[in-house]
Structures are given as C-alpha cells and as structure tokens.
Amino acid sequence: MFIEKFKVESPNVKYTEDEIHSVYNYETTELVHENKNGSYQWTVKPKTVQYEFKTDIHVPKLGVMLVGWGGNNGSTLTGGVIANREGISWATKDKVQQANYFGSLTQASSIRVGSFNGEEIYAPFKSLLPMVNPDDIVFGGWDISDMNLADAMARAKVFDFDLQKQLRPYMESMVPLPGIYDPDFIAANQDSRANNVIKGTKKEQVQQIIKDIREFKEKNKVDKVVVLWTANTERYSNIVVGLNDTMENLLAAVEKDESEISPSTLYALACIYENIPFINGSPQNTFVPGLVDLAIKRNSLIGGDDFKSGQTKMKSVLVDFLVGAGIKPTSIVSYNHLGNNDGMNLSAPQTFRSKEISKSNVVDDMVSSNGILYEPGEHPDHVVVIKYVPYVGDSKRAMDEYTSEIFMGGKNTIVLHNTCEDSLLAAPIILDLVLLAELSTRIQLKGEAEGKFHSFHPVATILSYLTKAPLVPPGTPVVNALSKQRAMLENILRACVGLAPENNMILEYK
C-alpha cells in the first residue's frame, strides 16, 4: 500500500510551529584490539549514543545557479522543471507524454514506513521532511557561451521536438551570465563556444561571481541560493606546497593571480565567502586542500564530486553484489562512447584523466571489505575508455565486462550494454543534490556529550549517493556501495523524525 504522507507520534519526537525535534538512539559498535591472556584479540562492543536533531520546517524560496547553465544538463533540468510546473504534455512516437520527475530520488522514490494488516506500507521519500518543491525553484547561472536557454535546448537535442516548441517561449529570455574561462583547464575544442567570459584577474573574477550571486538573490527575492557546477570537466589541478595546500596559501595565490587556480575552485571560493552551498558535478579536483580548509573554517557546505548517473551507478551495485556474494571480480573493463559536448571535451587527454580517476575508484571500498577474496593491496584490473562519437549525441553507450573467479577456480563473465540518455539521467540527480543540500542547511544535531546544537559537517557526505567520487571530511571512510549510501541518507532523515533505521529484519513475522 502507498500513502502520500504521515506524521510520527512518539515520546522521542515533537512538532512545533518552527521545527521538528527528535531524540534518536544511535546503535553502533566500538572495536578494541587488546591483550587477553597473553594474546591480542579483537573485541566488538555494542554501544548506544543518544543524539538530538532539530529540523527547521520553514521551506525557503530557493534559487539555483548553475555553472554551465547553457549546457545539455542545465537546459534539460531547466526545461524539465518548467514542463512539470506548467503541466506540459507532448506527443512522442509512442504516446502523449506527461512531464514527470522520474529518476529523482527525492521526487520519485519511496520509503517503507511499516506494515498494516500484513501489508507493507510505503510513502514518498519527500514525505520524510519538508523539502522545497522543485516547481518553485528559480534558475539562473553562468556560461562561457551567451546562447539563450531555448537555443541551448535545441542545440542539445535531448527533448522531443514537440516539447521544445512548447518550452521555447519560457526559455528564450533566459540568458546565462558571463562565466570564468581558462583554456588551460579544458579542451582546446571549447574555445569556439567562449564568447561570454568574465575578464580580469582571478581575484576580480571571484568578486564578480559574488556580485552575481547577490544580484540574483535580490532580483528574484529568493531566501537561499545553491550553486552547482555542471560545466565542462577540467583537468586536475596540481597540488603544490605553498600554492593551494592550505587556506592561507590558496587565498594568497588568488591575490597573486596564480595560473594553477582553476575556474571551478574560484566559483567554490566565492560561494564559501557568501556561505552558499557549492556542489561540484564534474570529476576534477575542485576542492583542493586549501579550499576544504576554508569551507570547514567558515562552516560553508561543499559537496561532490561528479554525478553518478549511469555506468558508474550500475558498477557500484554490481560489484557490491558480487563481493557480498563471495564472488571475486578480477577484471572490470568499461567502454563508453558519446557525442555531446561533454564527450568532445573529454576527448582531450588531460580532461579525460579526471574522469578516468573518478570512474576507477568507485569499487575500492567494496574490494577492501573482503579479506577472504583479496590479499592486502590486491585489486581487480580496472580499465576505463571514453571515445567521442558525434552521431550518437546525448545518447551515451556504456559497455562493461566483469570477469570474476568463482567456485573451484571457475570463471564467470558478465557483459552489460547500457544506453544512458546522459542529460535525462543527470538532470534529476542535479535536482536531488540541490534539494538535499538546501535541506541539510536546515538540520542541526548534537550528541549526548555536546552542549549545543550544530550543523552537519560542511563536507556533505549526506550527498554521497548522488556522486561518483564522494567528498568526505578528512579521516572519514569513503563509501561507494550504492545500497549503503542510500541507506545512510534515508536513515539520517528518518532519525530527524524519530524513526528507527530500516533494517529489514521484520521480526514481527518470524
């Protein structure tokens, strides 16, 4: 059975006009390596830690500014939200299609809330806590191309033509602000698009981005702004001692107009100055150590890296299944070809390397979790190939071969062919990222030993489910297994309304 909404009644949760206050008993374990009777052994000690959560229930008017607004992802997301808001339908070769938010975790997935008369009861994910309605988002942003969003949508060739015709009147007046352009960080083939750029030194560029954010917020009368990078993949920045390794060195490098500070880092820096959430949707190392230090010091939310939408999402499920089943993946070969501007930019070796790193590290935590299958330091052979084929456009093809060792020296091979409609998969993920980032800023918590409430750590691990290479605070384990990431996100939101984690034990029927 599916229900639209619910309210929790419990001694551990209290609803007021302004907030939801919950008390949550976090059950975990403590491991001790100790000497007992002359030999060392591991001891696992269950423990319970009490947390309190406060969630502000006042949903703000939200503005979303996209870096690369005129790209395929930006035009697809903007058009998709307009289509939903206006209730647009259009003819395809198969049927009359209604606008929807399929592919969005927050808008189109469900959670189990219990059982009733022997039947499982589910509710929308978005019913857990008050969230921004995507139809109410105000969009803006920057692009190095001055093409309006209607023409950008036509250039992208993602939407059906009938839908494009209906969206055009809404999108013709949407023109991106000039963006930061540094040809050293992206492929040379992007130069022909760069007719809308911010001039000046890096310090002046940061100041202009800050000015743009403030003017957007004032003009549109929004309460909050989230900024997200969905522009070209950049090459990796060199981490240099004395340049970007500390907060002080990074800020000094911007003052000196050092060439190795990337555009994405400059956007993030501007957002941190304004205490506005910044999310990196591409694989480059935007968050150099000095930038992370600054975000932590100023308690400004940052998240990333790289949207997890197609091939990598499948990989984080399949390898988790294989290793969890006691099967040993020994070779993973991933081949992609695509024909959109992302593919053209990735045809340059230096930008492809950023994507290769992002895609290759996704199985690390799953491999290291099983010392029966893998010796220390052992890892599957893992190869990632991306080729640019203009004809296929946004319809990316992903082909994977997984070779594994099975019982008694046998070999098992799984081959997948995945046609990933690149921007149609990425757009709802962008939506989830900005909605969850905004929600995160309204949640505070404290442990039983803490005197006052505080926000989540500014390095937003809560967004990990949506990213290929999750950004985590220093010293925090990286989790890539998709099921664990979703469980973490759902269970944190459940804790905010006093609900226990979903453990699937269903003891009442045993």
Curated annotation (Swiss-Prot):
**Which residue spans traverse the membrane?**
none
This protein's encoding gene = IPS1
Give the top-rank taxon of the lineage listed in the UniProt record for this protein.
Eukaryota
Task: Write the record's keywords in alphabetical order, separated by commas.
Answer: Cytoplasm, Inositol biosynthesis, Isomerase, Lipid biosynthesis, Lipid metabolism, NAD, Nucleus, Phospholipid biosynthesis, Phospholipid metabolism
A single Gene Ontology biological process assigned to it is: inositol biosynthetic process
Keyword tRNA processing in annotation: no
Q: Please name the GO terms that the record assigns under molecular function.
A: inositol-3-phosphate synthase activity
Pathway entry? Polyol metabolism; myo-inositol biosynthesis; myo-inositol from D-glucose 6-phosphate: step 1/2
- Its source organism is Populus euphratica
Per the entry, induction is: Induced by sodium chloride, copper sulfate and poly(ethylene glycol) 6000.
SUPFAM superfamilies membership: Glyceraldehyde-3-phosphate dehydrogenase-like, C-terminal domain, NAD(P)-binding Rossmann-fold domains
| Its EC number(s) | 5.5.1.4
What this protein is called in its record is: Inositol-3-phosphate synthase 1
EC category name: isomerase
Cofactor field: NAD(+)
The UniProt family comment states: Belongs to the myo-inositol 1-phosphate synthase family.
**Major localisation:** cytoplasm
Protein purpose: Key enzyme in myo-inositol biosynthesis pathway that catalyzes the conversion of glucose 6-phosphate to 1-myo-inositol 1-phosphate in a NAD-dependent manner. May play a role in oxidative stress resistance and influences ascorbate levels.
* GO cellular component term of the entry, any: cytosol
Where found, per UniProt?
Answer: Cytoplasm, Cytosol; Nucleus
Q: Which residues bind NAD(+)?
A: 70-73, 143, 180, 190, 193, 230-233, 281-282, 306, 309, 340-342, 355, 393-394, 422-423
> What reaction does this enzyme carry out catalytically?
D-glucose 6-phosphate = 1D-myo-inositol 3-phosphate
